[in-house]
From Swiss-Prot:
Membership in a protein family: Belongs to the UPF0178 family.
Pfam families given in the database record: DUF188
Protein name: UPF0178 protein BCAH187_A3092
Domain of life of the native organism: Bacteria
Length: 146
């Protein structure tokens, strides 16, 4: 198993790196050049930089990921593609994407986009909390312990 992180706006990178390096599971952070950093990563953690274009990180993750790899993303489109490839996909708020819930998530995203396109406002996501982080940590640890 390898872990791929859609890292541009991922608030749990520290949890992923800490728990995965402890378990000696390789982590690849995929992020745009606009988030470039000289910071040295721990052993087993690689950062891949991609262009800042829309979905560039998603495409790179899909090129790299294999069946049963673990992917962390908040992007429903990437989650859908990764599920079709046989990957395990987690959201940073501590839930697992499944073939049962991805259709509803994509439909909700589409309907919200149509409402915004018509000029109306939609609610954004709730703020990320410490409780969300701990929920993610517990879920993540359960998958890397397998």
């Amino acid at each position: 198993m390898k872990i791929y992180v859609d890292a541009d706006a991922c608030p749990v990178k520290d949890v992923i790196i800490f728990e995965a390096t402890k378990a000696e599971i390789p982590v690849t952070l995929v992020t745009s050049f606009s988030h470039y950093s000289n910071a040295e990563q721990p052993k087993g953690v690689e950062t891949i930089y991609v262009d800042s274009g829309a979905d560039a990180a998603d495409y790179r993750i899909m090129q790299l990921a294999q069946k049963e790899d673990l992917i962390i993303t908040q992007d429903y489109g990437l989650a859908s593609l990764a599920l079709a490839k046989g990957c395990i996909v987690l959201h940073h708020k501590g839930y697992k994407y499944t073939n049962d819930n991805i259709e509803q998530l994509l439909q909700t995203r589409y309907l919200s986009a149509m409402v915004r396109k018509s000029g109306k406002r939609t609610k954004g996501p709730k703020p990320f909390t410490a409780e969300d982080k701990e929920k993610f940590r517990a879920l993540f640890k359960s998958f890397i312990a397998r």
